[in-house]
Amino acid sequence: MSHQYYNPTTTRLQRSELAVPGSSPKMFEKALNSNADYIFLDLEDAVSPNDKISARENIIKALNEINWREKGKTISVRINSLDTHYMYRDVVDIMEQVGNKVDTILVPKVGTSSDVYMVDCLLTQIENQKKLKNKVGIECLIETALGMSNIKEIAQSSNRLE
């Protein structure tokens, strides 16, 4: 029998989760004062196409102005799917401007390990260029049959996975 060893991932308190649309800044303070341990600021499903860019700007502003960690919150940003033209700017703008204030990037519609690899490479390049001390984790949403059929490879694709 063969065994494969994995580096342990970061463990974060996640008893309750709250999704907050990036297009609704008034909801940021409510999320901050909620009992949720884990908050994901959403750039994907909860945001209409016309609001994608302003939602990204709202999230960057909120991460700069609000001390989420002081309230014990784990902060994730759900980026747009890799097959959209928003995804690249989501990762680059968030990481370059507030990468030190983000715990994880939530990647939707992951279908293969190469999807994770792409995000991992972007994060690594930005973290190195910006000299960020903490590595941002990656969380994957498996939402398709393709993702389910590749689940083992996806689960082994990065030591950033949480």
Report residues per predicted region.
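N-terminal mitochondrial targeting presequence
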Residues: 1-2
